[in-house]
């Protein structure tokens, strides 16, 4: 087992014209404990932490903590799938997909779609991944990530029919 970690730095998001909706400005990449790498693409629309207000109150606000885990979870909830990167961390660095921008932030350039795979995910898997992704930030206290993990148990949005993901629009806001 490897350490799980975010391979990209904190989120940069842009507010949409809709209340509580944001677009990711950068690709976000997470390496899970088994070495699997997941991508949440730039242009993805999110509402950050979608948890009941009472859970947020217990956990100390929805926007106080690193929001990258919520984006990964939102993607899984919207499509019932995740984007798996079919490259290793060292390959991503070697081919300059994982790099630093001029401000010194770790970023991920657009990975070609032939190096990506859409994989099915169950609600349980998505919720457990959410907790691991929160834990890996190393800034979200355990009481918060455990509370938020319990909160997503009540996410009945999963029961909606999932959207179909279109790889031809992966890095756009048209998804």
Q: How should each PLM-predicted stretch be described?
A:
Residues 1-175:
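Extended terminal accessory/targeting regions
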């Amino acid at each position: 087992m490897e350490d799980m970690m975010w391979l990209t730095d904190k989120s940069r998001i842009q507010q949409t014209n809709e209340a509580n909706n944001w677009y990711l400005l950068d690709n976000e990449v997470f390496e899970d404990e088994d070495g699997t790498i997941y991508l949440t693409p730039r242009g993805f629309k999110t509402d950050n932490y979608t948890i009941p207000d009472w859970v947020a109150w217990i956990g100390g606000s929805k926007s106080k903590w690193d929001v990258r885990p919520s984006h990964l979870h939102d993607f899984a909830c919207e499509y019932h799938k995740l984007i798996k990167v079919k490259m290793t961390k060292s390959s991503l660095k070697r081919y300059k997909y994982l790099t630093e921008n001029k401000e010194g932030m770790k970023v991920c350039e657009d990975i070609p779609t032939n190096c990506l795979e859409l994989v099915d995910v169950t609600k349980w898997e998505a919720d457990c991944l959410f907790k691991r992704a929160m834990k890996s930030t190393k800034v979200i206290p355990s009481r918060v990530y455990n509370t938020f993990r319990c909160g997503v148990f009540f996410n009945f949005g999963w029961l909606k029919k999932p959207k179909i993901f279109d790889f031809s629009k992966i890095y756009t806001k048209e998804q």
